[in-house]
Amino acid sequence: MRHEVHVHADIPILEGVSRRQVEQALGPWLEYLDADGLSDVKSLEPDEPGLKYDEKELILYICWTGEIGRSFHPALEQALENLGPYCYEAVEVDLTEYQDNGEQEGKLLFVGPTAQAIHEAQRRCMVEDLDAILGRQFDKEQVAQVTALVNRLFDED
């Protein structure tokens, strides 16, 4: 069963990493899409760039919507794992799946140079999300208590 998915991320790449290295790292995803390189990846949405590596800014821009099947997730996850060593820092990759019944499901993936960097990015995202949600209802001191607990949980993990 196939359905639509949107992948979005701005991934900072280390200086000296070539387009070819990025394409090789993304190989499992490119192969899944039957694409020879980044420029062959087209989004279903015409205003989305797909996959673009800005060699001047050292950022891999991902803004892609496509139709996927069962083997998509392993291909994407392997590509992100391969890309990790080329990342300047760990960042989130936002994945949204659109179901046939009209519902959508969001998932955050992470890519980064080390497991520790990814762990810290996960912590940062969790704390930012909690701060935004709880800050609407509670004062800063109360939110800080929850943040301290989350930080402790991440430290123990």
Predicted regions and their residues:
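Charged interaction segments
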Residues: 25-32, 39-157
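Short, extreme N-terminal segment that most often corresponds to the first beta-strand
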Residues: 1-31
